[in-house]
UniProtKB/Swiss-Prot annotation:
Function recorded in the entry: Specifically methylates the pseudouridine at position 1915 (m3Psi1915) in 23S rRNA.
Assigned EC number: 2.1.1.177
MF terms (GO), sorted A to Z: rRNA (pseudouridine-N3-)-methyltransferase activity
Family recorded in the similarity comment: Belongs to the RNA methyltransferase RlmH family.
Subunit structure, interactors included: Homodimer.
Protein name per the record: Ribosomal RNA large subunit methyltransferase H
Native species: Nitrosospira multiformis (strain ATCC 25196 / NCIMB 11849 / C 71)
Length: 156
C-alpha cells in the first residue's frame, strides 16, 4: 500500500519538508508515503475563488491513480482516534490499492473533490497551517502503522 499525500502549496519552509521526510523515512516498505505538491493557482489572476479551486481540483484529479481510496483532510471532517485510524488503515491494507490524502491550500479544496471523497477526516477542530498538516498527517500515518505492527512507538 502506498499513501499519497497531495498538498496544494509550494515553497514551504525547510522545516516542513524535514518534518515530513522524517516520518516518511520511518515507514515500512509495505506502507510507503509520498508527498506530491500541487502548485496553487495565482490569486491575482482576477478569477473567483471557485474557479481557482476548480482548476486546482482538475490538476489533482489528473494525478490521482485510478481506483485509489480518497481521503480529504478538512477541519469539518470526522475526528478519529489513533486506534480508529489504525483500524481503518488495516482494513484498507486488506482491500489493497493506494490511499490518497488531499490537503487543500489557503482557500481549501474544490468542493467536487470533497464530495467524491471516500472519507473526510479532520486532524483537529482547530484550523491548522497547511504545511503543518503535512507533518501531522505523516506522523499519524506512521503512528497508525506502528500500532498495526505492534511497534512500541505508540504507547497510549
Amino acid at each position: 500500500m502506498k499513501f499519497l499525500v497531495y498538498a496544494v502549496g509550494h515553497k514551504m519552509p525547510e522545516w516542513i519538508a524535514a518534518g515530513f521526510q522524517e516520518y516518511a523515512k520511518r515507514m515500512p516498505r509495505e506502507a510507503n508515503i509520498e508527498l506530491l505538491e500541487i502548485k496553487p493557482e495565482r490569486r491575482d489572476s482576477g478569477k473567483k475563488v471557485e474557479q481557482l479551486l476548480a482548476a486546482e481540483g482538475a490538476r489533482i484529479r489528473a494525478l490521482l491513480p485510478s481506483n485509489c481510496r480518497l481521503v480529504v483532510m478538512d477541519e469539518r471532517g470526522s475526528q478519529w482516534t489513533t486506534a480508529g485510524l489504525a483500524h481503518a488503515i488495516g482494513s484498507w491494507m486488506k482491500d489493497g490499492g493506494d490511499t490518497a490524502f488531499l490537503i487543500g491550500g489557503a482557500d481549501g479544496l474544490d468542493p467536487a473533490l470533497r464530495n467524491a471523497a471516500d472519507e473526510v477526516l479532520a486532524l483537529s477542530a482547530l484550523t491548522l497551517p497547511h504545511g503543518l498538516v503535512r507533518i501531522l498527517l505523516a506522523e499519524q500515518l506512521y503512528r497508525a502503522i506502528s500500532l498495526i505492527k505492534g511497534h512500541p512507538y505508540h504507547r497510549a
